[in-house]
Swiss-Prot record:
This is Gamma-glutamyl phosphate reductase. GO terms for biological process: L-proline biosynthetic process. SUPFAM superfamilies: ALDH-like (SSF53720). Keywords: Amino-acid biosynthesis, Cytoplasm, NADP, Oxidoreductase, Proline biosynthesis. InterPro entries: Ald_DH/histidinol_DH, Ald_DH_C, Ald_DH_N, Aldehyde_DH_dom, G-glutamylP_reductase_CS, Glu-5-SA_DH, GPR_dom. Its EC number is 1.2.1.41. Catalyzes the NADPH-dependent reduction of L-glutamate 5-phosphate into L-glutamate 5-semialdehyde and phosphate. The product spontaneously undergoes cyclization to form 1-pyrroline-5-carboxylate. The gene is proA. It is found in: Cytoplasm. It comes from Methylobacterium nodulans (strain LMG 21967 / CNCM I-2342 / ORS 2060).
């Protein structure tokens, strides 16, 4: 039974029943997906990509309706940009699904193998997580990215789009389902929640009677905070990306300038953008002014401590709140610190455990930074904006996680698996 048929049957007032049925269908699909070969999954994904291309006119028509409604609600320009689809963006969505099909199958990998003295042979094998719930806001492309990643890892996906992107997401999901079914995969392997009712989010966070194994939120801070606070199942997420670049005393100035500019300004609105620059006092006399002036001349507002404000009158005073702020804009906080220990302490106090970088030619300082900074991604002599599954060679990512359990850093297809132990014996019994 399709989700849209179910919606008509359940009625708008029975969201709980709707969601429970979606959960049961997803669990049944997950059991089937766990046994599907890698070749069949890839054929299904390539068929889904072809179906997205074929459905481009319908997808764009649905998107125009979403955009019309969003403009009538006077939503911000940034939201409209994330929501808008063009023929090129639809093609990029299809190409991303094909790229996921081209990744190695993460299921069935032998992660470890050993033999016990009693002759038992034990191996640890990668297996699907089961059912992944994804809650996202205005980006309709997440429908395809998340659905394809989950399916590649042998999972079923329950997707809940933001109300502003529901028509676009539904058109993409319908095309994907058409492709999957054509290759013999279950229609319920990727289900889009067909209602704007916010109660559907609460139902997903409850776990749908054990049918959802993990939740991944893709959106703003308020959404992520709600998911982290209310979910009764594990969550792969990060609340904020308060990323730091520390320019150590042994940093090459030319390298530091290019890394700082790229970390902050390549794209200011992504979670891997640097929000705070820390400069070692031991090199501040030579490094601080060029770094700050580069940022100012590039149009970046600088909020600094006393030493930083002395560089240029355009630098405004930094408050305590600035060290804790994810600007997602052309704004950066700059502080001079008393060496490596102070930099690590600052990051531990104000950071979000996302991505932090050190620029230095001192191998010992770099190793200490990489060992002691407790972030999902720690970087030596490179931009924080490499915090991305594609840049890690994972293909697409479903998000970046900063928790300490299971998935951490970019969450790609391998992170959407778990494992089981297979134990082979020859009649052994335990004494």
């Amino acid at each position: 039974m399709s989700v849209l048929t179910l919606k008509a049957r359940a009625g708008a007032d029975d969201v709980d029943a709707l969601m429970r049925e979606i959960g049961r269908q997803a669990r049944a699909a997950a059991r089937r997906m766990a046994l599907v070969s890698g070749q069949q999954k890839d054929r299904g994904l390539r068929a889904a990509a072809a179906a997205i291309r074929a459905a481009a006119p319908a997808i764009l028509e649905a998107n125009r309706a979403d955009l019309t409604e969003a403009r009538a609600k006077d939503l911000p320009a940034a939201t409209l940009d994330r929501l808008e689809l063009t023929p090129a963006r639809v093609e990029a969505i299809a190409a991303a699904v094909e790229a996921i099909a081209g990744l190695p199958d993460p299921v069935g990998r032998r992660l470890a193998a050993f033999e016990r003295p009693n002759g038992l042979s034990i191996e640890r094998i990668a297996t699907p997580l089961g059912v992944v719930g994804v809650i996202f806001e205005s980006r309709p492309n997440v429908t395809a990215d998340a659905g394809a990643l989950c399916l590649k890892a042998g999972n079923a996906a329950v997707l809940r789009a933001g109300s502003e992107s529901l028509r676009s997401a539904a058109a993409i999901a319908a095309a994907m389902t058409e492709g999957l079914v054509a290759e013999g995969l279950p229609a319920d392997a990727i289900q889009l929640v067909p209602t704007r009712d916010r109660a559907a989010v609460g139902a997903m966070l409850s776990g749908l009677d054990g049918c959802i194994d993990v939740i991944v939120p893709r959106g703003g801070k308020n959404l992520v905070a709600r998911v982290q606070n209310e979910a009764k199942v594990p969550v792969f997420a990060h609340l904020e990306g308060i990323c730091h670049v520390f320019v150590h005393a042994a940093a090459d100035l030319a390298m530091a300038r290019t890394i700082v500019r790229n970390s902050k300004l390549r794209r200011t609105g992504i979670c891997g953008a640097a929000e705070t620059l820390l400069v070692d006092r031991a090199c501040a006399s030579t490094h601080l002014a060029p770094l700050v002036l580069d940022l100012l001349e590039a149009g970046c507002a600088v909020r600094g401590d006393e030493a930083t404000r002395a560089v240029d009158p355009r630098v405004t005073p930094a408050s305590e709140a600035d060290w804790r702020t994810e600007y997602l804009d052309a704004v950066i906080a700059v502080r001079v610190v008393e060496g490596l220990d102070a930099a690590i302490d600052h990051i531990e106090t104000f950071g979000s455990h996302h991505t932090d970088a050190i620029v230095t030619h001192d191998t010992g300082a770099a190793e200490r930074f990489l060992a002691e900074v407790d972030s999902a991604i720690v970087v030596h002599n490179a931009s924080t904006q490499f915090a991305d599954g594609g840049e890690f060679g994972f293909g697409a990512e479903i998000g970046i996680a900063t928790g300490r359990m299971h998935a951490r850093g970019p969450v790609g297809v391998e992170q959407l698996t778990t494992f089981k132990y297979r134990v082979h014996g020859s009649g052994q019994i335990r004494p």
